[in-house]
């Protein structure tokens, strides 16, 4: 994954320093693209260890349409904890652990009506179910899009969706995906996002009877936080290792039937993890 290291170097060398919502400060570029051929290996970063289990559990959580972090915490995944404290959720009139209309809600219940107590009815549009059917029945469509960004609700959550929109493309019986990420925390978030959407592409390809093509990552505000510069420089001293392979249970034919046990990576080798603080 040399392209990722090239992005780190590009931001350090050419990015502009600016303030940000968290008060940490960033060095940013606007508009960047990376392409990964999924047939040549699974794009899980090797120049630092990435916790694949957290990526899988989070994606299954999204696909469930869940917005409460209890499922994550029950599975010992803590990546959303900073935004699910009582202090954070109280800002939006929600109980501790309830994030509101974040990814899972938008994917599975977009535009749902809201009750007086702040809960949502299950009367929204299921974008994932629609997408799967459309790929199966109309693979040449240029409308194979899922949006996590609902402008009417973006201000009602502690962290509005960063990876906002993704589109699929079928050619030669292979499924490709492009993600647009409005805000890209390149050191901590982007390695997770690349692997998560590559995994989703494999899963959807399997249930639609397709092979895999490319995953294209496109970033808007593409940045390194100021307190990640030294970690990025350390990572740039490391040579990428061969990519691992993804193995899915071939018996799973429905996207909503996947369980953690159905998903594994084979041959993952990496350099040691590099710790860095999360900006909230």
UniProtKB/Swiss-Prot annotation:
PROSITE patterns to which the protein is assigned, alphabetical: THYMIDYLATE_SYNTHASE
Active-site residue numbers: 162
Pfam short name (any one): Thymidylat_synt
Keywords for the protein's UniProt record, in alphabetical order: Cytoplasm, Methyltransferase, Nucleotide biosynthesis, Transferase
Pathway: Pyrimidine metabolism; dTTP biosynthesis
Main location: cytoplasm
UniProt-annotated binding residues for dUMP: 21, 142-143, 182-185, 193, 223-225
Keyword Flavoprotein (UniProt): no
PANTHER family: THYMIDYLATE SYNTHASE, THYMIDYLATE SYNTHASE 1
Quaternary organization: Homodimer.
Protein name: Thymidylate synthase
Protein species of origin: Acinetobacter baumannii (strain AB0057)
